[in-house]
Amino acid sequence: MNSKKQDAFQRLIGALKVLPNVGPKSAQRMAYHLLQQKRKEAEELVDALQTALRQVCHCARCNTFCEGGLCDICADETRDGRRLMVVHMPADVSNIEAANCHDGLYFVLMGQINTALGMDVSAIALDRLAQRLDGGEIEEIIIATAFTAEGNATAYVLSEFFKNLPYKVSRLSQGIPLGGELEYVDAGTLAQAVYERRLIKEGGA
């Protein structure tokens, strides 16, 4: 490759490396595959990504991704507004919904605390969570973070945040494997963890 083509190829590899669990070798293989065999699909991927960047935003209530002001769950008036489940990422909402074990509402942190990567309290949208709690009918908050070092650190910060607020606070039971991310937990185990959630504090300030 000449220098310009090499720069373009290396830029593509660099862009692919931002994806989760994609290292330099995987990114290089993906780049070769897209350019050599899947050019039409690559163009469709670029178009889909550009469309998503233009149209997808954060739900005004729960902070997940949606198109428009509210996501489908927040707009559903049949949901139980008394229970708010706090999760790490939108994938956790999808997994919990698939397990059919929570008919309340959600708040998506869009991050978790990871001191090794310099991700502190600012990574978990506490300001937006505080806004979500204003003027609502919420009675119980369910902390649904993973049982990893990052998830436990996030759960601790959340429990401290809720300590002096008038809500019953609970956390998923440890039926979820230690070190397990909710995204990869089967529906039965996840449902059991929700139903057997552990009380952190009773309602009342």
UniProtKB/Swiss-Prot annotation:
GO molecular-function term, one example from the UniProt record: zinc ion binding
Domain Toprim: residue ranges: 82-177
The keyword Zinc-finger is assigned to this record: yes
Protein family per UniProt: Belongs to the RecR family.
Domain of life of the source: Bacteria
Role noted for this protein: May play a role in DNA repair. It seems to be involved in an RecBC-independent recombinational process of DNA repair. It may act with RecF and RecO.
Protein name (database record): Recombination protein RecR
Zinc finger (C4-type): 59-74
InterPro entries registered for this protein in UniProt: DNA_Rcmb_RecR, Rcmb_RecR, Rcmb_RecR_Znf, TOPRIM_dom, TOPRIM_RecR
Protein source organism: Neisseria gonorrhoeae (strain ATCC 700825 / FA 1090)
Gene Ontology biological-process annotations: DNA recombination; DNA repair
Cross-referenced Pfam families: RecR_C, RecR_HhH, RecR_ZnF, Toprim_4
Keyword ATP-binding included in the entry's annotation: no
Record's keyword terms, sorted: DNA damage, DNA recombination, DNA repair, Metal-binding, Zinc, Zinc-finger
